[in-house]
C-alpha cells in the first residue's frame, strides 16, 4: 500500500528496514493471530531501494510475530505499523489491525508505533511531519508494553492546529492481579 511505502521510505533514514505485511487488505482484524491454519510468508519486490520485504497470507499481528521471531536476524529496536488509511482513535482502536500489530510487537518486547491518517487523498500533514514524528517518538522512552498511536489529520498543512501525544498499553492480559484487602473480612 501507499502508506507502507511512505513509512518505509521515512524509516530508512534511521536504520535497516524490513517490511512484513499481509498480501491484501486486513482491516478490522484487531489483534487476531492465526492458530489452526497454515500461513505462508514469501519475499516480494518492494519499491523502496534497500528495503527487504515479505508478504503473508496471515494477519498483521501474524506478520509482526513471524517477522520478529523468524525473518529479522536480530530483535528490532522498533516496529512501525501503518500508515493506515483512516483514523485509529476512540473505540476504533479495539478493532484496528494497525494498532493490534503494534500491540503484538509490544507483547514481544519491542517498542512500536502505529501510524494512521485521515481517509482522504490529502496527506500534507503526514508527509510534512512523518520523519519528525519518527525521530521524536523513538527518542522518548516507552514503558514496557506501551505503544505510540499516531493519527495524522486529513487537512491542509496550514490548517494544522498542533500535535497531541498519546500512548496505549498492551499488558498482554485482561486483568491485573492487584487486590485491595479492604472488605475481604
Regions found by a protein language model. Give the residues of each.
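Hydrophobic/aromatic ligand-binding patch that stacks against planar heteroaromatic rings
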Residues: 101-105
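Glycine/threonine-rich flexible loop motifs
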Residues: 87-96
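Short acidic, Gly/Ser-rich segments with clustered Asp/Glu that frequently serve as metal-coordination loops
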Residues: 1-6, 181-185
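Glycine-rich phosphate/pyrophosphate-binding loops
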Residues: 106-126
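Electrostatically charged, flexible surface regions
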Residues: 127-185
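A cross-family phosphate/adenosyl-ligand binding-site feature
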Residues: 7-70, 74-75
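Short, Asp-centered acidic motifs that coordinate Mg2+ and/or phosphate
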Residues: 78
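Short beta-strand segments
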Residues: 20-22, 81-84, 115-116, 150-153
Amino acid at each position: 500500500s501507499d502508506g507502507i511505502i511512505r513509512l518505509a521510505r521515512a524509516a530508512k533514514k534511521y536504520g535497516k528496514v524490513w517490511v512484513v505485511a499481509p498480501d491484501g487488505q486486513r482491516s478490522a482484524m484487531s489483534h487476531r493471530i492465526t492458530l489452526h491454519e497454515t500461513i505462508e510468508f514469501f519475499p516480494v519486490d518492494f519499491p523502496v531501494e534497500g528495503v527487504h520485504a515479505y508478504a503473508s497470507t496471515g494477519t498483521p499481528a501474524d506478520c509482526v510475530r513471524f517477522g520478529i521471531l523468524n525473518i529479522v536476524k536480530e530483535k528490532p529496536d522498533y516496529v512501525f505499523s501503518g500508515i493506515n488509511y483512516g483514523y485509529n482513535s476512540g473505540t476504533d482502536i479495539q478493532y484496528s489491525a494497525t494498532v493490534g500489530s503494534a500491540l503484538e510487537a509490544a507483547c514481544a518486547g519491542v517498542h512500536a508505533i502505529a501510524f494512521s491518517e485521515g481517509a482522504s487523498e490529502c496527506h500534507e500533514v503526514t508527509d510534512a511531519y512523518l520523519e519528525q514524528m519518527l525521530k521524536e517518538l523513538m527518542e522518548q522512552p516507552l514503558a514496557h508494553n506501551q505503544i505510540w498511536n499516531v493519527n495524522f489529520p486529513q487537512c491542509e498543512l496550514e490548517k494544522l492546529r498542533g500535535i497531541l501525544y498519546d500512548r496505549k498499553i498492551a499488558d498482554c492480559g485482561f486483568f491485573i492481579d492487584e487486590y485491595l484487602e479492604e472488605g475481604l473480612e
